[in-house]
Amino acid sequence: MISSLRRGSRSRLLLALVLTALFGPSTAHAQRPASALVAAPAESVGMSAARLARLTAVFGKEIEDRKLPGSVMLVARKGKLVYASALGVRDPKNPDPMRTDAIFRIYSMTKPIASVAAMILIEDGKLQLTDPVSKWLPAFKDVKVWTDGGEVAAQRVMTVQDLLRHTAGLPYGELTQNTAVKDALAKAGLFKPGVIEFDVRDMTGAEQVERLARIPLLYQPGTTWEYSLATDVLGRVVEAVSGKRLGVFLSERLFTPLRMTDTAFWVPPAKLARVAEAFDKDPLTGTAIRLIDVSKEPANDSAGAGGVGTASDYLRFSQMLANGGVLDGQRVLSRTTVRLMTSDHLGSRIAIAPTPGGGVLGASTYTFGLGFAVRPSDGIAPVPGTAGDFNWGGYAGTRFWVDPKEQLVGVFMVQSAGALRAYHRELFRQLVYQAIVD
């Protein structure tokens, strides 16, 4: 198997070089994804094709060393696709070459998509950031809050803004350190100790919300940032306001207008041969890797972690945001709404929880907006970027970012849920930024 994987990665690198020769070095080292952006020479938008080629070489070596099974990487600048590669294999158990239209489990990269859905309804005048969550989901009326001395009443209502910025006090069981909350989430079937990839899509969205609403909040609403189940609740709000299942609403208002043809909450039989898979075990730790089954329609469209899609679909979504809410003449959001979403919504008054759930944000020296991590300054963060850039990632290693000042968009798609996730995400970003030459 190892030798076949290495042969596959070498052949993929060779194919990349052949395509470069056919289409020119600045067309990105792989075939242009069918639904991605218009391609352009890297030099025409202030980037170096030779420097972008380092992505192919470096990640090709990572794949050859079995640190990744495969990857799809897309880079756009000034609205033009300047790099696209599909390296390694799609499935380690069946090592056919990775393809640019491979379908990935995007996990928490579903959150920005669901956040956009909520903002669409706000622009429609049907929802407000200040709306109490209980206005749309009555189960959250009169919620309690955990304290060392027991349960107390919430000092204010949980709002839609709290859901969007993860200040609602609805932590993930696997990321919080509060044992009482962990136990309550486990008893409610919303967390399984020792299983970070626990899948709750077998219950309906209504069941999930009813169970979650019975558990006291970890923090007073609006006081503390901790990565959370809030976006799953936000998805239920979108369903309550729109009267439609989340996937249907997104298809009508986002996926179809933007031609995101492969983004959904499960993969139908005709597309299963395109699904990317992970190694059975983490190559660094040997820990077993288990990803969600996307071959059957789930009981709920998990706004927090249930999405699947291609790199080109997510590039179109990201470019829409980079353009201020519009792509190819299809306006999804106002420019002012995108600016609101990608501004700092934590400020100095909201604490970052000293837990693994808080560290998801705090360790990266970013703040948080309405659905995205937002960079507050050019410096401090250990990755290149500029103030105002925004991003998010997914459990299986995926990551995207938009840098408005540099007019730069990056999409990194892998299925590598292990200890090397952060390293590969940062490596991708570093290699993209070093290719800027204007």
Positions of predicted regions on the chain:
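Short, conserved catalytic-motif segment at the N-terminal edge
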Residues: 38-106, 126, 141-148, 290-292, ...
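Bacterial N-terminal signal peptides
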Residues: 12-24
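Boundary at the C-terminal end of the N-terminal hydrophobic targeting segment
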Residues: 28-30
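Short active-site loop at a secondary-structure junction
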Residues: 61-74, 93-162, 218-230, 302-305
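Short, well-ordered beta-strand elements
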Residues: 399-401, 407-416
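Hydrophobic (often cysteine-bearing) scaffold residues that line and stabilize catalytic clefts
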Residues: 51-55, 106-110, 114, 160, ...
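Bacterial N-terminal signal peptides that target proteins for export
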Residues: 2-15
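Short, surface-exposed loop or secondary-structure junction motifs
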Residues: 35-36, 144-384
